[in-house]
Amino acid sequence: DRKIIGWDEILEGGLSPEATVMSWRGTSGGISAALQKHDVIMTPGSGGLYLDHYQGDYKIEPVTIPSAPAYLSRTYNYEPVPDTIKSLGLEKHILGVQCNNWSEYMYTNAKMEYQMYPRSLALAEIAWSPAKKKNFTDFARRVDANSVRLDERHVRYHIPLPEQPYGSCDKVVITKDTVVTFQTSRPMKMVYTLDGTTPTPASAVYTEPIKVSGNMTIKIATVLPSGKMSKVRTIDVEKQNYAPAVNVSDTKAGLQLRRIKGNYLKVNQLDFADAEWQDCGTVTNLNKMKVSQPDDAATLRGANNYGAIAEGFINVPEDGVYYLSSRMEQVWIDNKLVINNEGAVKAGTNSDNAVALAKGLHPVKFVYLCNIVGGWPSWWSNLNLEMRKDNQKKFTSVQGTQYFHK
């Protein structure tokens, strides 16, 4: 006999007596269904059970659906049977646990496997092991030691990358002697070089923050017990003076905006477009660079393609080294290209940069292309510019009151 299994939205319309509920929007749906004596499969994204979510710092991981990191530890530490269900003796209604792996941004089988392993191994253990028997430290040791079994079967899998606290970036700008700190999402050996050569398992072992005083290149990777290494990260360290502000008088609020119709995949195509640029006034909110799309744009049909440029000045509040992040096609400051996402899937960004800026006004230009790359419509992206001083922990969006034009 057939029996219905449905996502937890079916709770909203009343359940047939034999319906099984898949609780994906947290655990509340599963608890509610079990209280009604319905069987449940637990699969909440909040429990690290969506394998298409990032498993490391999204600023250096391959692009996938925008999401908070679902580290291996998060998946492993998920407990499928909520305490509420245990206290009521309704454990029998929790049939099991499931991971999901949506594939919109998995363009190859290798990428699919990379997202699945080793978190699918954690899924097996949380499904079969009593909570009191679980030990993440021991699990991680076994995963790392037995990765050779995956290698023998030519299975791609995730090896945690060396990450920087508060957001990884392949460019580090300094104005004085400092240190560069790295960490991994679980305890792992890291090796590095400072002479431009590619590190090997026998290279210097990272044991403390790396001292930097001038221009140099850090190459760093993690190493498994087998000697297999992660992708090597290359971090360019550059000593800069604060770029001077410009002296501009009689400025007005906002950036000057212009648009041009057409389907553009490269910024230089704007220079050879047949259409004419249209003056669109001024904007203080960068999302206003976008235009409203037809109702069926969510299905990726009927979109109005165009390019847009907003330019003027940005007011930097104080001297400092600033880390920059944006999903714009390009961002220019002081007539220098500081962020370049050209051709990238804008679901995420691996193009963060850093620059030393003096307090005051600096020329700025934002380039936006309304197109679809890798299945991601660029109009889904938030077009803000985020900045973080090197002594701050969080990025914040630049406020509209910081933009000016002549």
Predicted regions and their residues:
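Edge beta-strands of jelly-roll/beta-sandwich modules across compartments, strongly enriched
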Residues: 373-385
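Substrate-binding clefts and catalytic carboxylate motifs of secreted carbohydrate-active enzymes
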Residues: 60-176
